[in-house]
Amino acid sequence: MTVPNSNIKIIERDEWLKPYENTIRRRHDNAIRSLYSLTLKNQIPLSDFANGYKYYGLHIEQAESEDAGLNTSSGHTAFGRHWVFREWAPNATAIYLVGDFNGWQETEQFRLTRIGNTGDWEIRMPIDAMSHGQHYKMNVYWRNGQGERIPAWANRVVQDEDTGLFSAQVWNPTDKYVWKNSSFHPNRSPLLIYECHIGMGQDAERVGTYNEFRENVLPRIVAAGYNCIQLMAIQEHPYYGSFGYHVSSFFAPSSRFGTPEELKRLIDEAHTMGIAVIMDIVHSHAVKNENEGLALLAGDESQYFCQGERRRHPAWDSLCFDYGKKEVVHFLLSNCKYWLEEFHFDGFRFDGVTSMLYYSHGLGESFVSYDDYFNGRQDEDAISYLTLANLLAHQVKSDAITIAEEVSGMPGLAASFEDGGMGFDYRMSMNIPDYWIKIIKEQPDEKWKPSSIFWELCNRRKDELTVSYCESHDQALVGDKTIIFRLVDSDMYWHFRIGDQNDTVNRGIALHKMIRLATLSTINGAYLNFMGNEFGHPEWIDFPRENNNWSYKYARRQWSLVDADDLCYKWLGVFDRDMIRLVKGTNDFVGTAILEIWHDDNQQMLAFMRGNLLFVFNFSPTVSYADYGLLVPEGSYNVMLNTDSIEYGGNGLADDSVTHFTNFDQLYAKQHKGWLKLYIPARSAVVLKLEDK
């Protein structure tokens, strides 16, 4: 099928893409052809194709006629409610369900039947054949082999505390969760994301729960001003220390945090509080475990995954999906719809998109020219899948949020499908944290150049929205350092009590605030913070593992630090809250252009405006400027935020209660501009508001 698509706007908006027009059009056509095929030549919506989770797995069905009745092992037909279980396993020769209900023994009553030549297997069972809470697996046979497997579509998987083994669990609670808020719509003006991990969301050295997070952490996020949480590690994963990125059961919310109903309540109450909930979804790879995952479900290594060298991810020790298979696309698209519909997630942050886009997974690639995006080394099946996933998400929820974690800079990633892009709403600005780390590590403070900082913060494609951030969970992992730890290091342990700060701590506190303000104030779409980093949470993240004696000491958040009135963490937490409030309280902040007013690299000064807000930064570690003149729109200006305020751990050197008026200059009178004279202390930033006349 060929579909005319003459209006590829991403090419019109970027003349450097013109030489690659044929490739861009081919990729767009591939997605259109896939959509046409999956929707039966546009006879059904894509969301209907993605209903696999309603068909496969374990369900209760209602038989309403003799033809739809249950054929029991005795040959009689039963009516009414009954269990049905289905699995796609084309390579299998026999499948049995084994579990608590049959003593984990293979019996004819629980033997599946192949459905024609589809590769599907099915069994129908009386409603009393199994009950809520019972454990089960599949015994799968194939030519010259056999294995005990967890169903691919299982929606509840638990780990035995004694043996450590995982099994599926019959999940049919008497009290179904009743949603209280079904009409929630995310606030994107702007989108302020709080990246979270349920298990490490508490002070105690253990795994936290959905309920604890809902009761204790959600109120903190509301108070801090964020309007979206990004939940990590929701899909079931065998190894806690993988941070949730080695997924085994894609449809099962991790049971180590609680029940599905408890997760639903968390999301429901977040919505009631005005907080959107997006999921860190992993479709870039899967765990290689055979017993827990999809690796060798029915003896065929290529059932879900690529063949040969492309099967195993060389850096992640995991398996790579074959996005060219219709059944794999069905599985993954159904997974997207499942989380949106069944759990009311508001969207996804797609992990590892770079790994999906390139046959090399982006490893060893430099991405220095446009050739690197269109040289034939891209997985166009993956590009098609990601495009379909975005179309589906926005079809299921028109205001769904989709974010791509992508480091190469692939053009069109966050451009709309109609314009020739892949359809993500946002892409992660992964250059920003790398830049902050680089200058902190490699440049003394007096060498920081505001022009370079400003350029890096605004370095993005003009037609694509981004998520700006100083640091995420990646920068906090063991082996790396958070920004505050790079700035202060071990002095956090000895001089972070208020009144006992040394020069290193004072420097770190000042720069921590300036870095966060500079990053947030230059966003064009969204902003992200990993939980605890807003108040300078100490140390790294290190999940329990053999090398640390399975300790939870560094797999938690010490909220008590920011709650303590005698510690410097309080200053950083209050500053972050007020900074977020300022941006949230500004009408159409992200829709307002960034206008550079002035920079001087020798003086280390930077000033820019967004609407009626003036942002002024003095990165000099030693020089304060009195009566520093900035040519700005004439009028009166009031201080809205000052990193040097005493309440934020600053020195309070300026009187922020003073209204500042511009000085008349005949030379700029026709432009309605005047000179604003300000006192800007060293290593500080101030935000002023131009008042209405």
Predicted ranges, named:
Residues G164, H344-D346, G364-Y552, K584-G629, ...:
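Conserved alpha/beta catalytic core and glycan-binding cleft of carbohydrate-active enzymes
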Residues F85-W88, I95, G99, S620-S636:
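Surface-exposed beta-strand/loop patches in extracellular or lumenal glycoproteins
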Residues N390-L391, K397-S398, R557-E596, V687:
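Aromatic- and carboxylate-lined catalytic core of secreted/periplasmic carbohydrate-active enzymes
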Residues H132-G133, S657-K693:
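C-terminal beta-strand-rich structural cap/linker in extracellular carbohydrate-active enzymes
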Residues T2-N71, F79-V84, T113-E195, M200, ...:
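The feature marks proteins involved in alpha-glucan
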Residues M579, G629-F664:
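C-terminal accessory region downstream of the catalytic core in glycan-modifying enzymes
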Residues V158, K176-R188, I193, H197-Q378, ...:
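Substrate-binding/active-site clefts of carbohydrate-active enzymes
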Residues E87, C196, I221, L231, ...:
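Conserved, mostly hydrophobic/aromatic
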